[in-house]
């Protein structure tokens, strides 16, 4: 079972399609790509938006998957 993590969007660039989430547990910032955002609308995030996600190890560090805005 995958652990769900909550955090706040540190920043997200909709033109480039990626950004970073700061987990509420104080752990290292997590990379997020627009393709990981679960939405039927335009896949973007806003600074300081609260989200829930799972983390996987990506090629350059932790990467968010199954990102849902709260």
Curated annotation (Swiss-Prot):
It is found in: Cytoplasm. The keyword DNA-binding applies. One of its GO terms (cellular component) is cytosol. Residues 7-67 form the CSD domain. CDD domains: CSP_CDS. Transmembrane segments: none annotated. Its main location: cytoplasm. Keywords: Activator, Cytoplasm, DNA-binding, Transcription, Transcription regulation. One of its GO terms (molecular function) is DNA binding. It comes from the Bacteria. PANTHER family: COLD SHOCK DOMAIN CONTAINING PROTEINS. This is Cold shock-like protein CspJ. The lineage of its organism: Bacteria, Pseudomonadati, Pseudomonadota, Gammaproteobacteria, Enterobacterales. The gene is cspJ.
């Amino acid at each position: 079972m995958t652990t769900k993590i909550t955090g706040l969007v540190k920043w997200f660039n909709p033109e480039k399609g990626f950004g970073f989430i700061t987990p509420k547990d104080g752990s290292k910032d997590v990379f997020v790509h627009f393709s990981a955002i679960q939405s039927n609308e335009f896949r973007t995030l806003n600074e300081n938006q609260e989200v829930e996600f799972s983390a996987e190890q990506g090629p350059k560090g932790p990467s968010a998957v199954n990102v849902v805005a709260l």
